[in-house]
Design a protein with these regions (language model features):
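Extended interaction regions within the primary functional domain
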Residues: 1, 40-41, 122, 139
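Rieske [2Fe-2S] iron-sulfur-binding domain
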Residues: 92-200
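C-terminal segment of N-terminal export signals and the immediately downstream linker at the start
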Residues: 26-69
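Extracytoplasmic/periplasmic/luminal assembly and interaction segments
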Residues: 63-110
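Pocket-edge structural micro-motifs
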Residues: 53, 66, 74-75, 126, ...
Length: 200
């Protein structure tokens, strides 16, 4: 039997060519597959909401939509801002420091944690009670006039959840004794002009 001489350079070329074509085929298959897992353009557009806060009158609350959820936007008056402070003993998490709570990344300074907003005048919160997701009612008046005997006489005003009786102050901080475990959530947002916020 005669041994045939193997052409190693040709074998290496065929091996490299086949491997290269296999890699190209795998990449061509993977790109559309991975692309199909990315959100569609309309989904990305819905994940962010722009809103002009200057359209909210002082003392007024408006409800807008973000990712299918209602969002409170409140233009707090000077009187409302005064009533945000001075009742920490009534609150579960007065400085918004709970580790497992949903808070925006920008909430770093003590003032931002108390007012829970980038600009103290404008408060932007997810309009969903942190107990079971009901929408709390906005009752900005101080004292028991709108609240009844279930709150202290010097109550500063805020929100009341009619489903199970949770209370929140004018910064959306939950009151001791409420079934809600956390303050109302502050979603990520930023100002893209002096009066326009981009939520999401």
């Amino acid at each position: 039997m005669q041994e045939e001489k193997v052409n190693l350079s040709r074998r290496n070329f065929l091996y490299i060519a086949a491997s290269g074509l296999g890699g190209i085929a795998a990449g061509a298959t993977a790109v559309p597959f991975i692309g199909s897992m990315l959100p569609a353009a309309d989904t990305l557009a819905a994940s962010k909401t722009e809103f002009d806060v200057s359209t909210v009158a002082p003392g007024q609350l408006v409800v807008i939509q973000w990712q299918g959820k209602p969002v409170f936007v409140v233009h707090r008056t000077a009187d409302m801002l005064k009533r945000v402070k001075g009742h920490d003993d009534l609150l579960k998490d007065p400085n918004s420091e709970a580790i497992d709570a949903v808070q925006a990344e920008w909430m770093k300074t003590p003032e931002q944690r108390i007012y829970r907003s980038i600009k103290p005048d404008y408060l932007i919160l997810v309009a969903s009670c942190t107990h079971l997701g009901c929408i709390p009612l906005f009752k900005p008046s101080a004292g028991r006039k709108e609240w009844g005997d279930s709150v202290p006489e010097d109550w500063p005003g805020g929100w009341h959840c009619p489903c199970h009786g949770s209370y929140y102050d004018l910064s959306g901080r939950v009151v001791n004794g409420s079934p809600a475990p956390h303050n109302l959530h502050v979603m990520p947002y930023k100002y893209i002009s002096d009066t326009t916020v981009l939520i999401g």
